[in-house]
């Protein structure tokens, strides 16, 4: 397995996405599944909408740097089934992130308040459409959470087997 590190922009974007996705997933599922007081529920929603709105332009940057700064593979690894699984897993993560972000915007039933600094208009006003995208968003969030758990599990398995892949994503 190659020991080449990811570029600094890729590392920074990865950990930024990781922190926000883990926070938004845990707090979002808690907000959905638990009977939280209304003030806490609204606070979580406000923070999650603001944080994930921040991810939208960063997602474009992340795609750019993934293509512009690829990490070299060892030739033997390129044909290995685990390498293909890793590529498919990462592609699924990117697709799920994109779907969660897009459906999150399209499900909004009110303007998007970005940390009280900027208010973006609600893109759709038809209740059937916002309800549809709300449903898509919920399923996409579950899929993303499962993919993140699988991603973390794969990293732990690699570490346990003596392949320190995590070191490639650390400064």
Describe the residue ranges of each PLM region.
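Membrane-embedded alpha-helical bundles that constitute the cytochrome b-like, heme-associated redox core
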Residues: 1-171
């Amino acid at each position: 397995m190659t020991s080449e590190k990811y570029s600094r922009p890729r590392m920074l974007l990865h950990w930024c996405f990781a922190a926000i996705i883990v926070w938004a997933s845990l707090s979002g599922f808690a907000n959905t599944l638990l009977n939280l007081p209304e003030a806490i529920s609204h606070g979580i929603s406000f923070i999650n909408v603001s944080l994930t709105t921040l991810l939208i332009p960063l997602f474009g940057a992340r795609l750019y740097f993934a293509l512009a700064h690829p990490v070299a593979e060892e030739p033997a690894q390129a044909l290995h089934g685990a390498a293909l699984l890793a590529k498919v897993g990462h592609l699924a993560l990117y697709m799920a992130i994109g779907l969660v972000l897009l459906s999150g915007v399209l499900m909004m039933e009110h303007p998007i308040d970005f940390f009280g600094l900027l208010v973006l208009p609600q893109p759709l006003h038809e209740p059937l459409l916002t309800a549809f995208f709300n449903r898509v968003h919920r399923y996409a969030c579950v899929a993303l959470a499962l993919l993140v758990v699988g991603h973390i599990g794969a990293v732990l398995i690699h570490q346990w087997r003596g392949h320190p892949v995590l070191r490639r994503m650390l400064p």
